[in-house]
Amino acid sequence: MFRIFKMSFAVIIIILALIAFNYTEHTSVIQSVMLVFLGAVMFMQGLEERKKENDGSGAFNIYTAVFVWSVSLIGFTLHII
């Protein structure tokens, strides 16, 4: 089940990267949205690693996902200001 979500989020990230490459004037918003999906992929990967009893790698992925989400939140708020 996680694999389907990870693959769909990865496809969304690739599509957003291609859109950001074509529209250079709106990249700040697209990059923040792309970071949200990247964080979701990393979070799901962390949950999978925790299920495999690989707690160190799973915790690292979850912490990194939270960091990526906080960076995207900062990007959203800076774009609004």
Curated annotation (Swiss-Prot):
Localization per record: Cell membrane
GO cellular-component term (any): plasma membrane
Chain ranges passing through the membrane: 4-24, 61-81
Topological category with respect to the lipid bilayer: Multi-pass membrane protein
InterPro entries for this protein: DUF3953
Chief localization: membrane
Keywords: Cell membrane, Membrane, Transmembrane, Transmembrane helix
KW Hydrolase (keyword) present: no
Highest taxon listed in the record's lineage: Bacteria
Protein name: Uncharacterized protein YczI
Organism from which the protein derives: Bacillus subtilis (strain 168)
